[in-house]
Amino acid sequence: MAKLKVIQFDGSFKGEIQPANHLLLKKAVIQPVFDAILLEQAACRQGTHSTLTKGEVSGGGKKPYKQKHTGKARQGSIRNPHYVGGGVVFGPKPNRNYKLKLNKKAYQLALTSAFAQKLNNNQVIVAEAKLFEQTNAKTKKMLTFLKNAKLTEQKLLFVIDTISKPLLLSTNNLKQIVVKQFNKVSVRDLLLAKTIIIEKAAFTKLEERLK
């Protein structure tokens, strides 16, 4: 694995960083990564999908019309499922817990494997200290940086040490950029990003997290 280059605001590179040895995975570990993705996606489900049954629909306390001599089929309630606005038969109810379980070691391995593959594919760039602050909370300056770095058409993941208000404001209107703290980066975040730009301080702490 080659050393990681440190990018400047003008798009040039100055300095290098050597990744830790435990990130030198030669082959991706597929199964833990797959399980971690399922875990993360299941955790996003709110479980609020619900329909009303015949007993829960309002109205229909009496027969809509008399039993006989109407020329129509007999009906007992407008809450019956075949009526428009009636109850739903076998509809979804939020009585299921969608959360999955995965051992901590397996999830850690999935994170390490996903990040290591990005390193092996030269898809990780280290940002110099306070690079993102140079945008001054301006989207235009962030676009200038992306243009200088030739990253305007890519889905990007910015990994930071601490929450930076100028960075959030400068990327808020750029849908191709996801900003995450080093301790909140998920396997899905790593895999979806075409290029990862990570602060120096965040890179050191992320290495510790992935040990």
UniProtKB/Swiss-Prot annotation:
* A single GO cellular-component term on record: ribosome
Single GO term (MF): structural constituent of ribosome
| Keyword Cell cycle carried by entry | no
Q: What keywords does the record list, in alphabetical order?
A: Ribonucleoprotein, Ribosomal protein, RNA-binding, rRNA-binding
User: The organism sits in which domain of life?
Assistant: Bacteria
Biological process according to GO: translation
Biased composition regions of type Basic residues, renumbered to the chain = 63-72
- Show the InterPro entries listed in the entry: Ribosomal_uL4 (IPR002136), Ribosomal_uL4-like (IPR013005), Ribosomal_uL4_dom_sf (IPR023574)
Q: Does the keyword Membrane apply?
A: no
Q: How does it assemble?
A: Part of the 50S ribosomal subunit.
User: Which family does this protein fall into?
Assistant: Belongs to the universal ribosomal protein uL4 family.
Give the protein's function: One of the primary rRNA binding proteins, this protein initially binds near the 5'-end of the 23S rRNA. It is important during the early stages of 50S assembly. It makes multiple contacts with different domains of the 23S rRNA in the assembled 50S subunit and ribosome.
The record's annotation in HAMAP family points to: Ribosomal_uL4_B
Q: What is this protein called?
A: Large ribosomal subunit protein uL4
What organism is this sequence from?
Mycoplasma genitalium (strain ATCC 33530 / DSM 19775 / NCTC 10195 / G37) (Mycoplasmoides genitalium)
Q: Which gene encodes it?
A: rplD
